[in-house]
């Protein structure tokens, strides 16, 4: 009984887990049909290789016999064989690419849905045993493509190699004949000796390849991680360019990037040193196999058991058998890379399966907190003895010193902080406005209106921009620019309030939303919000005393600590 090592069993289990979502889904007939067509093309390629092998035999026999007419027939027949071979091979590659993009599109959408479901993209950073998983963006952008492309190329390559192996093993057995020799007065006849020889050589070569290259897999995992970290830090540097320049922090950032690249360099050296030994062996192995069949067939040729055509046919069959039987040796690098990708993507898969079980009750008609306490992930108390009630149209101020836990309480009410005890009810679709609004690159109108439930015409948008003090931007709503870099902190907060007025949410959580504005302007804008959204319930955090008078009620966080 064959025993599969536990590490390999675990890898296979991870692999199947990643394959099942796409291939076991309903309405997948087109992808299955593509698989069938590609497999048929693979069999067509194998058949053409058999024809070419026969052509090789006939050509060299005609050449040795100097049969001019037959040689010309074979020369004219070769372009037809080549044309059919190229036609099938090119279209097979095209269909594999089509299947790749179909699979990638579906799987990318699948993992994006898992990542964004129930705010999972946020919880993956703070929740569970995999919270420190690096670069989830790379898992979606790169690892999915690598998984699919490697799976298809290796799978179809293996099937083609297996088909070629079976076919040409039969041909090699028949064409090479029997090796006869005498040892100690005993005559030995070994039929199919070429097949036995190539099998033994490849088995030994495969075992040696695995011994030499088994360290490549963890090095590939490290390579992907270090490259992703370097790329991410470069992106962050670009985003924070202004802050770095104002802080004169260039040398610090430069050193950090140099340290990141040093990690890449160290991994590269370890990987290339390990790869060198594998390359030594693969080159020795492949070069030796290219001439070995001549030596093995020499006794048969000298004794007249096979002619020149038979020699070339058997040699080609030997090469095809050895090459396809050596599939594992030649594909070891790709298999190691695929294994590393499986590990990384499965880790991300596990990450997106984690869900916090503790959530506030979803309540649309009020925010209710009774005998509640807010805690850290390690169960330390941040706030306790919390009790308040907010009805639609009412404003509540959360008051307390910096660091008291006001923002954490707002996160809890927004269903983004699962560490609490007690009775908390709040709407799951509330609108949270932070002191640093998300402003991306793009058309200004799209940036402001993208999340709105209904379309907004230019006139309405222009009117709201004037109301929040951004009238100068009304003429630029169709401009495409890097607004996150262009707008000041105060202008970004005005944009956030414009979004709020246009969206008209029923429940609003304001977290230092006007902190970058002068107090009188903050009062004016929040009064505008209350005027435009009279039925919306609002819970706000602010350190601007003049704004406190806008609240109907105050919950002093400091008093419950």
UniProtKB/Swiss-Prot annotation:
Residues 35-337 form the ABC transmembrane type-1 domain. ATP binds at residues 400-407. GO terms for molecular function: ABC-type transporter activity; ATP binding; ATP hydrolysis activity. InterPro entries: AAA+_ATPase (IPR003593), ABC1_TM_dom (IPR011527), ABC1_TM_sf (IPR036640), ABC_transporter-like_ATP-bd (IPR003439), ABC_transporter-like_CS (IPR017871), ABC_transporter_sub-D (IPR050835), P-loop_NTPase (IPR027417). Residues 25-31, 92-151, 209-290 are periplasmic. It is a multi-pass membrane protein. It is found in: Cell inner membrane. Keywords: ATP-binding, Cell inner membrane, Cell membrane, Membrane, Nucleotide-binding, Transmembrane, Transmembrane helix, Transport. One of its GO terms (cellular component) is plasma membrane. It comes from the Bacteria. It holds the Pfam family ABC_membrane_2. The chain crosses the membrane at residues 4-24, 32-52, 71-91, 152-172, 188-208, 291-311. Residues 367-561 form the ABC transporter domain. Residues 1-3, 53-70, 173-187, 312-561 are cytoplasmic. Its main location: membrane. Belongs to the ABC transporter superfamily. This is Inner membrane ABC transporter ATP-binding protein YddA.
């Amino acid at each position: 009984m064959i025993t599969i090592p536990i590490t390999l069993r675990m890898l296979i289990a991870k692999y199947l887990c990643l394959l099942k979502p796409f291939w076991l889904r309903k309405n997948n007939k087109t992808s299955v049909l593509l698989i069938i067509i590609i497999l048929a093309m693979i069999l067509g390629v194998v058949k053409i290789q058999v024809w070419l092998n026969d052509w090789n035999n006939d050509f060299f026999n005609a050449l040795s016999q100097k049969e001019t007419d037959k040689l010309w027939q074979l020369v004219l027949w070769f372009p037809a064989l080549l044309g059919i071979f190229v036609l099938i091979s090119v279209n097979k590659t095209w269909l594999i690419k089509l299947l790749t993009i179909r699979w990638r599109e579906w799987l990318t959408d699948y993992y994006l849905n898992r990542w964004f479901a129930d705010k999972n993209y946020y919880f993956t950073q703070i929740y569970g045993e995999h919270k420190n998983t690096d670069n989830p963006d790379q898992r979606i952008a790169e690892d999915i493509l690598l998984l699919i492309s490697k799976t298809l190329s290796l799978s179809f390559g293996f099937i083609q190699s297996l088909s070629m192996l079976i076919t040409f093993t039969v041909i090699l057995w028949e064409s090479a004949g029997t090796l006869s020799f005498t040892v100690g007065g005993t005559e030995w006849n070994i039929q199919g000796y070429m097949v036995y020889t190539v099998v033994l050589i490849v088995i030994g070569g495969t075992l040696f390849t695995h011994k030499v290259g088994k360290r490549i897999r963890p090095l590939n995992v490290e390579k992907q991680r270090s490259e992703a970290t370097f790329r991410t830090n470069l992106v962050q540097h670009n985003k924070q360019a202004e802050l770095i320049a104002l802080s004169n922090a260039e040398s610090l950032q430069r050193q950090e990037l140099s340290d990141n690249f040093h990690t890449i360099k160290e991994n590269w050296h370890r990987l290339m040193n390990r790869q060198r030994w594998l390359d030594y062996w693969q080159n020795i192995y492949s070069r030796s196999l290219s001439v070995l069949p001549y030596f093995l067939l020499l006794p048969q040729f000298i004794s007249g058991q096979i002619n020149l055509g038979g020699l070339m046919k058997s040699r080609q069959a030997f090469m095809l058998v050895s090459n396809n039987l050596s599939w594992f040796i030649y594909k070891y690098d790709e298999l190691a890379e695929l294994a590393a990708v499986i590990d990384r993507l499965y880790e991300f898969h596990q990450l997106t399966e984690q869900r916090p079980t503790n959530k506030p009750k979803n309540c649309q008609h009020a925010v209710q907190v009774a005998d509640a306490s807010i805690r850290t992930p390690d169960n330390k108390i941040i706030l306790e003895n919390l009790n308040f009630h907010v009805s639609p149209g009412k404003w509540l101020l959360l008051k307390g010193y910096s660091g008291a836990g006001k923002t954490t309480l707002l996160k809890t009410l927004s269903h983004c902080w699962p560490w609490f005890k007690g009775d908390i009810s709040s709407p799951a679709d509330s609108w949270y406005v932070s002191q640093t609004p998300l402003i991306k690159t793009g058309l200004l109108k799209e940036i402001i209106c993208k999340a709105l439930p209904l379309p907004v015409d230019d006139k309405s948008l222009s009117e709201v921009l004037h109301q929040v003090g951004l009238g100068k931007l009304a003429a630029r709503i169709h401009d495409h620019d890097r607004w996150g870099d262009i707008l000041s902190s105060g202008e970004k907060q005005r944009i956030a309030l414009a979004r709020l007025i246009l969206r008209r949410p029923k429940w609003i959580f304001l977290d230092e939303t006007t902190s970058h504005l002068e107090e009188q302007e903050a009062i004016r804008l929040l009064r505008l919000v209350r005027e435009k959204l009279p039925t919306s319930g609002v819970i706000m955090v602010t350190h601007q005393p003049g704004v406190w008078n806008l609240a109907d009620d105050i919950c002093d966080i400091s008093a419950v600590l």
